[in-house]
Amino acid sequence: LLFQRYKVSLMQKLLIKGKKELKGNIYISGSKNATLPILASTILASEVRLLNVPFVKDIFTMLELLKFIGIKVKMKRNKNILELKNEKKEINTLAPYKLVKTMRAGVLVLGPLLTKFKKAKVSLPGGCAIGTRPVDLHLFALKKLGAKIKIKDGYIIAEARKGLMG
């Protein structure tokens, strides 16, 4: 076998040349950390269909949060497919503690809610067994885009009357 290493930007590529050509297919399971932001962004769309969804606890919690907000969720668990519909013009802009406390990804609905409805109230997240994971980078970015943000009684209260710009 011959190994060649190429430096490509910050990523590396490993090229392997062997005596036999490799053929076939492999199944790559879905990623929770890729799916959660996509789910949060469905607040901005009218209809979304996602394939290869990993049905794990944080995904189920995010789906409960989206249902609470007002999005219809249809699961096809045997095929790892999700269908989401956002038919309401007015939806709930609150992400309550009971749903956000078990996963830090709940803060991801803040941007889409602000974008679409110009206001949001999202509980400070929990759910991390390895220590506190601050949301200050999210808040910093939203402030730079024009949001007014305050923390009160365990909630992030955000407003962007003129919308988010940037």
Per-region residue spans from a language model:
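Extreme N-terminal basic, low-complexity initiation segments
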Residues: 2-6
